[in-house]
């Protein structure tokens, strides 16, 4: 597996994990972000950044961003995003 494939696989896995909660569970903590250390599927030591951001106005869809990079080379990292849409019938306030 190439370095890029390895970082992408780790980012996809983390993005899937980051999107396991629904909009209502994440909304009360948005905006939020964190960085932690971990390992890729191929065993590389990397940093994972996870962020939950409003995709527009507060209370709109939530954009989830995951970046995976080797500590010495942020610019060569992989960044993936996904949206968690707001349920139009969800009447909870943020």
Regions found by a protein language model. Give the residues of each.
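Flexible, low-complexity segments enriched in proline/glycine/serine and punctuated by aromatic residues
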Residues: 1-94
């Amino acid at each position: 597996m190439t370095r890029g494939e390895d970082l992408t696989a780790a980012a996809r896995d983390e993005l899937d994990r980051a999107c396991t909660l629904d909009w209502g569970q994440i909304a009360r903590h948005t905006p939020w972000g964190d960085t932690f250390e971990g390992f890729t599927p191929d065993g590389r030591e990397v940093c994972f950044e996870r962020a939950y951001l409003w995709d527009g106005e507060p209370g709109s869809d939530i954009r989830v961003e995951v970046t995976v990079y080797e500590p010495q080379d942020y610019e060569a990292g992989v960044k993936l995003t996904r949206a968690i849409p707001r349920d139009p019938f969800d009447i909870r306030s943020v």
